[in-house]
């Protein structure tokens, strides 16, 4: 398996040894330094109106308004996006019902190299405060970034490795905000300086601190309230008055979720060389976060026999917290190759040293470490009569270890080597696209003496027909494969943070799926509409099944492999409905729905229900005013032992004011979320029954750029 690393690392070495030059920035003085042509996650050379990659871009004031402590909660206003929302300190995106190891969170095209895909209680090590642009990709083109993106990808862009030289003066960005629901205070800033006409230095940092989350209504969902009240009655009958009182207090608690505070900070620096023939840059970053892990009332932490007992009385459970940190090095470069068949060589690489500790009070429970590397090389083709594309190699390695009484996964080494290509042909109004990826994966559990190897081939084919000036209809078909993760293969033990006993299966085969997708995009001078329908048929779909059994007073979740079917739709529309006094009055709406069933009739757990969101926005040169209503349906299509979730209606409003006329350099935002303080729960969340969404949240944000 060592040879798997040789090819991409050799290519990386060639590029690092080559002279790195890049085109100097030739934009005028009035141009915004950060304004760039749209970047499409599939590759920068592919049209934004493509078939295989359904891309949503979030940036600017929209990103500033929606920023939360984790990227999952930041993106939930986008079509087809929900979040795991385990706690304010840990929330990952859910795309089309997919989460975990089927969604990749990327940092400029390569993985976050953390442990957030392993378990829902692990936070993403990218602070949204440092992110300038987010691209959400659904559809088969995401497979170019690995089989772990079989459900989609979220690509986060910062400017730690500069793409252009700031003109005339250093470039400074800053953002600061306050949110009332958790007394959330945050600030971030970045600075780019041209040390020479070809050398750019970058520094950035961020800080965030929040308290316990305030919520509308009862903390516990009705069914869990009943369970806790029954448990309190049993404790009272047995004479355990203190335990009964604690359970009664938890059952009737309103207004907040205990142990959900978060304290995090980041620091980073980068250096980039930019000239006419290419560019090369390197960045070093550090991420540190400490956050509370809310626990289900009545759930007991796992202890070794006799531990936590004295004189026959059970010791009071201490709060669980996670201390997380990551050091990371990133490299990005490209070389112009001239006018041959390939016109550009791109490289992207990263190494990270990650660890987090799960504490029970002041005592160390379990230590998780993850040392990982990911590298990509891409050769892009020059446009030849409407044909263009790219071909590349990717290597990934993850050395994961867990030490402690509740290490539910043994030490594992995962290595993956892949080759991929994406090709596009434009024939007048007709466009064709094809993508393919082959990857070899090995997962080795050293202490168990088990090593599994998987070969996965994925391919997609799509066609698009353009009609009118800006409208199109596209269809695509795909075949995808995903190797099981180490956690799905080898889990066997109690997991303190999720309060579950997790059991994997080392005999799993690769997960395979066939997919079909159709997209209609209509755009006029005053309106736009995008409709997407999709379906996937899985052979060997892997999921965590709640067995209804208990081990060490914890519910047992067993990973199983079954055939499954998933389908759904996403719809987006916007229109200008009036113009007056220098303002445009616009209306917009989104709708999304996913259905997923296991063969034999069971529903896939944690699938978001139907959602509708509509808004009215008054937009002017200096002032924007917005009001919106989000309606989420009940979710009664649940798996065995999974509880249903009540729907909710939430009203939000915001105002953005730009006091200076010069290029929106200063923006002040005031937003009121969940104005009527409703009790709302996200069905995709593992903790939904005891961690509601934030109640009324008044947020103030200031954003400066010059």
Question: Which positions does each model-derived feature cover?
Answer:
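Short, acidic, small-residue-rich periplasmic hinge/interaction motif at the N-terminus
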Residues: 23-64, 72, 100
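Gram-negative outer-membrane beta-barrel transporters
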Residues: 26-27, 389, 528-538, 555-636
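Short acidic/polar hinge/loop motifs at secondary-structure boundaries
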Residues: 111-140
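Flexible loop and strand-edge segments within Gram-negative outer membrane beta-barrel domains
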Residues: 258-264, 277-344, 351-374, 405-407, ...
């Amino acid at each position: 398996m060592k040879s798997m690393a040789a090819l991409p690392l050799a290519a990386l070495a060639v590029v690092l040894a080559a002279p790195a030059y890049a085109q100097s920035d030739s934009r005028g003085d009035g141009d915004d330094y950060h304004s760039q042509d749209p970047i499409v996650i599939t590759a920068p050379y592919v049209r934004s109106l493509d078939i295989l990659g359904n891309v949503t871009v979030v940036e600017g004031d929209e990103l500033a308004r929606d920023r939360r402590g984790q990227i999952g909660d930041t993106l939930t206003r986008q079509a087809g996006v929900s979040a795991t929302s385990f706690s304010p300190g840990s929330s990952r995106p859910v795309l089309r019902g997919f989460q975990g190891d089927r969604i990749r969170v990327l940092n400029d095209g390569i993985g976050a190299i953390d442990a957030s895909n392993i378990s829902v209680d692990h936070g993403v090590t990218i602070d949204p405060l440092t992110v300038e642009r987010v691209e959400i990709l659904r559809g088969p083109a995401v497979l170019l970034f690995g089989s772990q993106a079989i459900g989609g990808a979220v690509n986060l862009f910062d400017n730690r490795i500069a793409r252009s030289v700031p003109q005339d003066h250093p470039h400074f960005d800053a953002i600061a905000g306050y949110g009332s629901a958790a007394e959330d205070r945050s600030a971030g800033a970045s600075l780019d300086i041209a040390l020479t006409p070809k050398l750019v230095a970058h520094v950035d940092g961020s800080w965030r601190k929040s308290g316990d989350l305030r919520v509308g209504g009862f903390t516990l969902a009705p069914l869990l309230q009943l369970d806790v009240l029954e448990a309190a009655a049993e404790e009272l009958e047995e004479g355990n008055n203190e335990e009964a009182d604690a359970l009664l207090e938890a059952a009737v608690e309103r207004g907040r979720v205990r142990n959900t505070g978060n304290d995090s900070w980041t620091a980073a620096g980068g250096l980039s060389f930019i000239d006419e023939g290419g560019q090369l840059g390197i960045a070093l970053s550090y991420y540190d976060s400490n956050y509370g892990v809310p626990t289900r009332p009545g759930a007991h932490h796992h202890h070794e026999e006799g531990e936590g007992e004295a004189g026959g009385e059970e010791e009071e459970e201490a709060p669980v917290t996670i201390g997380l940190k990551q050091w990371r090095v990133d490299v990005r470069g490209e070389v112009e190759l001239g006018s041959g068949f390939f016109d550009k060589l791109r490289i992207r690489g990263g190494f990270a040293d990650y660890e987090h500790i799960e504490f029970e009070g002041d005592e160390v429970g379990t230590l998780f470490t993850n040392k990982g590397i990911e590298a990509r090389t891409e050769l892009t083709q020059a446009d030849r009569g409407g044909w263009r594309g790219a071909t590349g190699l990717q290597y990934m390695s993850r050395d994961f270890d867990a030490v402690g009484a509740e290490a539910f996964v043994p030490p594992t080494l995962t290595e993956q080597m892949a080759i991929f290509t994406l090709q596009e042909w434009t024939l007048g109004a007709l466009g064709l696209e094809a993508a393919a990826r082959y990857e070899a994966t090995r997962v080795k559990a050293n202490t168990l003496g088990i090593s599994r190897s998987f070969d996965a081939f994925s391919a997609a084919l799509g066609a698009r027909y353009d009609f009118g000036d800006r409208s199109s209809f596209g269809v695509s078909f795909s075949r995808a494969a995903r190797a099981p993760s180490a956690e799905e293969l080898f889990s066997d033990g109690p997991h303190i943070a999720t309060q579950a006993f997790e059991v994997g299966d080392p005999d799993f085969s690769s997960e395979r799926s066939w997919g079909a997708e159709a997209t209609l995009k209509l755009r006029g001078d005053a309106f736009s509409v995008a409709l997407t329908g999709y379906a996937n048929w899985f052979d060997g779909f892997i999921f965590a099944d709640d067995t209804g059994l208990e081990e060490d007073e914890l519910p047992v979740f067993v990973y199983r492999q079954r055939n499954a079917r998933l389908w759904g739709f996403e719809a987006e529309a916007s229109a200008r409905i009036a113009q007056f006094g220098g303002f445009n009055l616009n209306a917009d709406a989104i709708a999304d729905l996913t259905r997923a069933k296991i063969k034999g009739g069971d529903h896939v757990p944690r699938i978001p229900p139907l959602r509708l969101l509509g808004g009215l926005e008054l937009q002017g040169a200096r002032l924007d005013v917005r009001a919106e209503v989000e309606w989420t349906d009940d979710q009664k299509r649940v798996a065995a032992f999974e509880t249903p979730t009540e729907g909710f209606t939430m009203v939000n409003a915001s105002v953005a004011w730009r006091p200076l006329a010069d290029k929106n350099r200063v923006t002040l935002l005031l937003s009121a979320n969940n104005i009527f303080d409703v009790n709302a729960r996200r069905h995709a969340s593992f903790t939904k029954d005891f961690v509601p969404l934030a109640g009324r949240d008044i947020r103030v944000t200031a954003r400066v750029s010059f």
